[in-house]
């Protein structure tokens, strides 16, 4: 199965353009598609769905705002239609209003892909957005 990962620090290639950053996982995938044009079209479609500007493909990752970088990181995690997306503190660098907008966009994409999202966060206010919650502190306390 295919797994998408959203890193806390995004790990975008600063010298590569947005589309190259998004399709990067496909190049390392065992189920690599031979059609590069379709990969780029899929990446542009994800950019549009995540409300990135129409000309976003002309920018290098290093020139993007933090919010744009996060959206590119989400697109990169979703490009292969993963069954599981693992997100490590994907909203940690955003204020509360931007967090809600970003999470709405991310959850919409996860739902469209019918993926499962496993998100790590220290922000307990995010808990209400999820179907299931595991509090590691409680688990460790019960185990001891």
Regions found by a protein language model. Name each.
Residues 16-25:
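Short coil-to-helix segment of the ABC ATPase nucleotide-binding domain corresponding to the Q-loop/switch region
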Residues 36-55:
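Conserved ABC ATPase "signature" region
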Residues 60-64, 68:
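Conserved ABC ATPase signature
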Residues 74:
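Hydrophobic anchor residue at the start of the ABC signature
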Residues 81:
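Conserved catalytic motifs of ABC-family nucleotide-binding domains
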Residues 85-88:
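Catalytic Walker B motif of ABC-type/P-loop ATPase nucleotide-binding domains
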Residues 95:
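ABC-family nucleotide-binding domains
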């Amino acid at each position: 199965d295919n797994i998408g990962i959203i890193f806390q620090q995004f790990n975008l290639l600063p010298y590569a353009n947005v589309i190259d950053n998004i399709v990067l996982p496909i190049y390392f995938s065992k189920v690599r598609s031979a059609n590069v044009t379709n990969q780029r079209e899929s990446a542009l479609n994800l950019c549009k769905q995540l409300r990135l500007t129409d000309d976003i493909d002309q920018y290098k990752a290093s020139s993007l705002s933090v919010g744009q970088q996060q959206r590119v990181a989400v697109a990169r995690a979703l490009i292969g239609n993963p069954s599981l997306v693992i997100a490590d503190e994907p909203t940690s660098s955003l204020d509360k209003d931007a967090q809600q907008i970003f999470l709405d966009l991310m959850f919409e994409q996860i739902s469209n892909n019918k993926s499962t999202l496993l998100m790590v966060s220290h922000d307990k206010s995010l808990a209400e957005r999820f179907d299931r919650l595991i509090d590691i502190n409680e688990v460790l306390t019960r185990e001891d």
